[in-house]
Amino acid sequence: FHDCGVPLMLKRFPDYMTVLEEAYGSAGPEQRVVDTENRAFNTNHAVVGYYTAKSWRLPEHVTNAIANHHNALAIFSDESSRNSQLKNLLAILKMAEHICASYRVLGNQVEDHEWNSIGHLILDYVGLSDYDFENLKETVRELGAH
């Protein structure tokens, strides 16, 4: 549900998929996926998703996760942040997105540029090594859950 803003953006902006693919292609430490959308449309799917979730009266911690799901680098880089509920949701979400290869489906990319920027912070936060995460990813994919 965190990407519920994507179909709404598609409906409103005919060239949205082209911009989204560009956004995933240029994502990294210096540029978030939503920065490209903001430049093109003065809004982005995370903002639209946040307001959709609020209008559905979803809990605040869920709406905050939707709003911030492309702000993971800043959130996980800030060690003073005490918002463990947000970090927990985002950690699970970002690992799931990487395992399910959202960067291929939504961004038409062969590489997960966003994960390359944040993966080490996420895994450190949840206490997983790269090796453990690769095993988890393989297990999930073998179960057909990707």
Regions found by a protein language model. Name each.
Residues D3-H146:
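Metal-dependent nucleotide-binding catalytic modules
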